[in-house]
Regions:
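Metallocofactor- and cofactor-centric catalytic cores in central/energy metabolism, strongly enriched
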Residues: 1-261
Length: 261
């Protein structure tokens, strides 16, 4: 077990040296490291959700990104107490997107989405003091607690890792999931393929990957454009084949039937 978070280290814990230079033992070091990992994951997935919220805010009837599931948008708006009657769907999209973006840095209160959890689960979170607050606050708090000279109690560090994880799962990641459906359509059962054999030797092969479906959706959209297909043929290909790997592969597979490489 090794701690590398300050310039006086690294400190390696051994039977002869059970504590680091700051006095932290193996349990505290593992707790710090685990919390840092959790903060990194929460920041990554939540930032994906933030990008989707910004994309929803930029949606327009004549723009590249449109609202493809207005019914789901209206359901979410009502869930959040937003008036929907008589509103243009894009005005509503922008209002809901702004509220979602405020979930990342609001100074008071807890995440809106946690109200979806079963009541008894919410009571457990409240009792244990891990109901997630603003998404970015949980990440910031995690990095604060796991920095040199700060928390060394493993119980407190692991407790905050729970809170940061919930802030992601019931905050940033849920924003990404729900508003991706609003923008790109809610998935339905669909047939597709999975294998490296989905690539076509005579075609231009484009493999989409990553977390955020905003770019991959546009790639899929324009791969079917006659102008793009003509361009591919002008350089000797027979067409364009899109396939996917990683999380984005699932996004385009379940909405468009794009095969997984």
């Amino acid at each position: 077990i090794c701690c590398r978070i300050c310039a006086m280290g690294p400190c390696r814990i051994t039977p002869k040296a059970p504590r680091g230079i700051c006095g932290c033992d193996a349990h505290g070091i593992v707790g710090r490291n685990y919390l840092k990992f959790t903060a990194g994951g929460a920041a990554t997935h939540s930032d994906h959700g933030r990008e989707i919220c910004h994309t929803l805010y930029a949606s327009a009837p004549d723009g590249a990104y449109k609202v493809k599931d207005p019914e789901k948008l209206i359901r979410i708006a009502k869930e959040w107490g937003v008036e929907t009657e008589g509103k243009d769907i894009y005005d509503l999209a922008h209002e809901v997107a702004e509220l979602a973006l405020l979930e990342y840095g609001k100074p008071f209160g807890f995440q809106r989405w946690v109200q979806r959890a079963p009541k008894h689960t919410q009571e457990i979170w409240e009792r244990e003091g891990i109901t997630p607050r603003a998404i970015d606050r949980e990440v910031s708090c995690s990095l604060h607690m796991s920095h040199m000279g700060c928390s060394s109690k493993p119980e407190a560090l692991v407790r905050q890792s729970f809170r940061a994880g919930l802030g992601d799962g019931w905050g940033g990641s849920m924003c990404g999931t729900e508003f991706s459906d609003v923008l790109f359509g809610t998935p339905k059962p669909i047939d597709t393929e999975a294998n490296l054999g989905v690539m076509v030797a005579e075609n231009v092969n484009i493999v989409v990957h990553g977390h955020d479906p905003s770019l991959s959706e546009m790639i899929c959209e324009y791969a079917d454009d006659p102008e793009m297909i003509a361009y591919a043929k002008s350089v000797g290909a027979k067409g364009i084949t899109i396939s996917g790997v990683c999380c984005t592969s699932n996004e385009v597979a379940m909405r468009r039937g794009i095969p997984m490489a």
